[in-house]
Amino acid sequence: MARSLSKPPFCEVKLATNNSVTKIWSRRSAILPQFVGKTVSIHNGRIFIPCKISPEMIGHKFGEFAVTRKKPIHKKKK
């Protein structure tokens, strides 16, 4: 079933109330307008990826900006 359009965006309460957000483990939280201009570190499962929040990111999820998979490196033929 699809998500209803009448539901508000999800954001962890701790993120919305804290003014000094630096590390984010909640990748499912939506980016709100109050985060614009801040630099946050988003956890990708292994390390924290620094990311500066811009106005274009509002409404997206934090997890979209920290990839969790490595790109494959193929051997070159000699």
Curated annotation (Swiss-Prot):
Gene3D superfamilies in UniProt: 30s Ribosomal Protein S19, Chain A
GO BP: any one term: translation
Stored InterPro entries: Ribosomal_uS19, Ribosomal_uS19_bac-type, Ribosomal_uS19_CS, Ribosomal_uS19_SF
Listed Pfam families: Ribosomal_S19 (PF00203)
Superkingdom: Eukaryota
MF terms (GO), sorted A to Z: RNA binding; structural constituent of ribosome
UniProt cross-references to SUPFAM superfamilies, sorted A to Z: Ribosomal protein S19
Protein name: Small ribosomal subunit protein uS19m
Source organism per UniProt: Prototheca wickerhamii
